[in-house]
Amino acid sequence: MTFRLIAENRKARFNYEIIEKIEAGIVLQGTEVKSIRAGKMTLADSYAVVNREELYWLNGQIAHYEHGNIHNHEPFRSRKLLLRHKEISRLIGLVKEKGLSIIPLRAYWKGSKVKLELGIAKGKKLYDKRATTKERDWQREKQRILKTNH
């Protein structure tokens, strides 16, 4: 199977500590698929919630299809995510007991299907974000020093 990246949530790894990753399918309408093929999908500020034993992706944007008609889709509608019932039950336990969040990390094509890589995540505090930034800056500086010495 080939994996072609559609969109990535770059802020997710900065704002959250990713504990576990899972793959989920998405229930889409026809114009949404066409819009995704045109690269009009955004994962920023979106999340997943469990509602009545089903998993939904909220606040994710798939822009209007340019060549669509009056039956075009709603860009910010909630979309059902496809997982096995056993996996959803496990997610319910993690979210309720430990206070974790479910956030999309990236969207990609797997064959002809659109898949979301979800992260079970814990929010970082401000000082954790500062430490991450400091560590990243130090790694860049270290690489720069090593380059100039060789």
Swiss-Prot record:
The gene is smpB. It comes from the Bacteria. PROSITE patterns: SSRP. GO terms for biological process: trans-translation. Required for rescue of stalled ribosomes mediated by trans-translation. Binds to transfer-messenger RNA (tmRNA), required for stable association of tmRNA with ribosomes. tmRNA and SmpB together mimic tRNA shape, replacing the anticodon stem-loop with SmpB. tmRNA is encoded by the ssrA gene; the 2 termini fold to resemble tRNA(Ala) and it encodes a 'tag peptide', a short internal open reading frame. During trans-translation Ala-aminoacylated tmRNA acts like a tRNA, entering the A-site of stalled ribosomes, displacing the stalled mRNA. One of its GO terms (cellular component) is cytosol. Its main location: cytoplasm. GO terms for molecular function: RNA binding. This is SsrA-binding protein. The lineage of its organism: Bacteria, Pseudomonadati, Pseudomonadota, Alphaproteobacteria, Magnetococcales. Keywords: Cytoplasm, RNA-binding. CDD domains: SmpB. Belongs to the SmpB family. It is found in: Cytoplasm.
